[in-house]
């Protein structure tokens, strides 16, 4: 007698069917993360293109900010809402716009729309890297690295204005608008002297330096295994052997510096660690600015410079420049406040 042993058929529910469809092999992978990424990225980019094409910033900042008004690619922006709206999300159906699309554009409703969809789109992209890493069986360091840009975006566009009085003080989504925000951070927070900014600069420039050194060193030590003027075509993605000599690279840098990386895994972890840590540190600094925390204040130099007209340092010159930026920028940047500074309070000194 033959006994057949087998599993009872398992019923597949709608979740399993959807899971199979989302993870199907296609030119552009969708996945569960795609349910967040693609709609949010589409909305954020579409909102930005709409705003920069024909939406004015006259009612929020007193500025022209669209192609329709004569701005160009470097000066268009989706600008932040007016200061009076505080931290309202300015929903189209909310009490401010009341379902009126034109009014929603005028009061700056596109800014929170782009900011929030952009933030969730970036998070969706990081989840996409996690998901694909898991499916192909590799570690998720790409997603971990991408947490750096997400931290910067969230801290600059969301955390900073949340710590201030309104979304008005967030950067507008445009090249010149972000330049204005950088000048604002310097004038009102002395951002360049902040140690977290210094760590961010060290991380980004250090990462660029490591990238350049690594690329040049690999190019220097490629095996001459091709007949062409360059060795690019001699490489096969599936080849088992190395395409460059780590031993030669190690010997070269040992002669240059006296020390060199001898472990590829440690080398590449270091290239990951430096820029990502820089991004995270600068994000921490921005959250500090949101709370109006001060960094370095060399009060002794300021007091001596005030008493002794012959004593001045680069620090005291920068403090004067910051005072000038605040005095002349605030009336332009915040016209709704009607700032009027009498002549005697405007900074004077060798720096200006």
Swiss-Prot record:
Membrane topology field: Multi-pass membrane protein
GO cellular component terms, A-Z: photosystem II; plasma membrane-derived thylakoid membrane; plasma membrane-derived thylakoid photosystem II
Further remark: 2 of the reaction center chlorophylls (ChlD1 and ChlD2) are entirely coordinated by water.
Chain positions recorded as chlorophyll a ChlzD2 binding sites: 117
Catalytic activity from the UniProt record: 2 a plastoquinone + 4 hnu + 2 H2O = 2 a plastoquinol + O2
Entry superkingdom: Bacteria
Keyword Transmembrane recorded: yes
Species this chain originates from: Synechocystis sp. (strain ATCC 27184 / PCC 6803 / Kazusa)
EC number: 1.10.3.9
Known partners and oligomeric status: PSII is composed of 1 copy each of membrane proteins PsbA, PsbB, PsbC, PsbD, PsbE, PsbF, PsbH, PsbI, PsbJ, PsbK, PsbL, PsbM, PsbT, PsbX, PsbY, PsbZ, Psb30/Ycf12, peripheral proteins PsbO, CyanoQ (PsbQ), PsbU, PsbV and a large number of cofactors. It forms dimeric complexes.
Gene3D superfamilies: Photosystem II protein D1-like
Gene that this polypeptide is encoded by: psbD
Gene Ontology MF terms in the entry: chlorophyll binding; electron transporter, transferring electrons within the cyclic electron transport pathway of photosynthesis activity; iron ion binding; oxygen evolving activity
Keyword entries, A-Z: Chlorophyll, Chromophore, Electron transport, Iron, Magnesium, Membrane, Metal-binding, Oxidoreductase, Photosynthesis, Photosystem II, Thylakoid, Transmembrane, Transmembrane helix, Transport
Function: Photosystem II (PSII) is a light-driven water:plastoquinone oxidoreductase that uses light energy to abstract electrons from H(2)O, generating O(2) and a proton gradient subsequently used for ATP formation. It consists of a core antenna complex that captures photons, and an electron transfer chain that converts photonic excitation into a charge separation. The D1/D2 (PsbA/PsbD) reaction center heterodimer binds P680, the primary electron donor of PSII as well as several subsequent electron acceptors. D2 is needed for assembly of a stable PSII complex.
Residue sites binding chlorophyll a PD2 per the record: 197
Top enzyme class: oxidoreductase
Entry binding sites for a plastoquinone: 214, 261
Annotated positions binding pheophytin a: 129, 142
Positions on the Lumenal, thylakoid side per record topology: 54-108, 163-190, 289-352
Protein name, per record: Photosystem II D2 protein
Transmembrane segments: 32-53, 109-131, 141-162, 191-217, 266-288
Residues bound to Fe cation: 214, 268
GO biological process per UniProt: photosynthetic electron transport in photosystem II
Coiled-coil regions, chain positions: none
InterPro entries in the record: D1/D2 (IPR055266), Photo_II_D1/D2_sf (IPR036854), Photo_RC_L/M (IPR000484), Photo_RC_L/M_CS (IPR055265), PSII_PsbD/D2 (IPR005868)
Cofactor binding note of this UniProt entry: The D1/D2 heterodimer binds P680, chlorophylls that are the primary electron donor of PSII, and subsequent electron acceptors. It shares a non-heme iron and each subunit binds pheophytin, quinone, additional chlorophylls, carotenoids and lipids. There is also a Cl(-1) ion associated with D1 and D2, which is required for oxygen evolution. The PSII complex binds additional chlorophylls, carotenoids and specific lipids.
NCBIfam families for this protein: psbD
């Amino acid at each position: 007698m033959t006994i057949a042993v087998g599993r009872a058929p398992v019923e597949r529910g709608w979740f399993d069917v959807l899971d199979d469809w989302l993870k199907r092999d296609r030119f552009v992978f969708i996945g569960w993360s795609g349910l967040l990424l693609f709609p949010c990225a589409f909305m954020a980019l579409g909102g930005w293109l709409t705003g920069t094409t024909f939406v004015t910033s006259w009612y929020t900042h007193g500025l022209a900010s669209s192609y329709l008004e004569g701005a160009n690619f470097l000066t268009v922006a989706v600008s932040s809402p007016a200061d009076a709206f505080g931290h309202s999300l300015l929903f189209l159906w909310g009490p401010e716009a009341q379902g009126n699309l034109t009014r929603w554009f005028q009061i700056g409703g596109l800014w929170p729309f782009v900011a929030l969809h952009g933030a969730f789109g970036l998070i969706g992209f990081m989840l996409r890297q996690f998901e694909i890493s898991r499916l192909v069986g590799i570690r998720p360091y790409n997603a971990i690295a991408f947490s750096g840009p997400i931290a910067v975006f969230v801290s600059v566009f969301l955390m900073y204005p949340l710590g201030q009085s309104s979304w008005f003080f967030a950067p507008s989504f445009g090249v010149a608008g972000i330049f204005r925000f950088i000048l604002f951070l310097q004038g009102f927070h002395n951002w360049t002297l902040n140690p977290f900014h210094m760590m961010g600069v060290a991380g980004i420039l250090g990462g660029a330096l490591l990238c350049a050194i690594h690329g040049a060193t690999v190019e220097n030590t490629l095996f001459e295994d091709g007949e062409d003027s360059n060795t690019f075509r001699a490489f096969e993605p599936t080849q088992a052997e190395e395409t460059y000599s780590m031993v030669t690279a190690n010997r070269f840098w040992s002669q240059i510096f006296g020390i060199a990386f001898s472990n590829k895994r440690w080398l590449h972890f270091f290239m990951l660690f430096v820029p990502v840590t820089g991004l995270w540190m600068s994000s921490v600094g921005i959250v500090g600015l949101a709370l109006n925390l001060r960094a370095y204040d060399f009060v002794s130099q300021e007091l001596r410079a005030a008493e002794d007209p012959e004593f001045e340092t680069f620090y005291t010159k920068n403090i004067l420049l910051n005072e000038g930026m605040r005095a002349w920028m605030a009336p332009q940047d915040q016209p709704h406040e009607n700032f009027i500074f009498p002549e005697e309070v405007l900074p004077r000194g060798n720096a200006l």
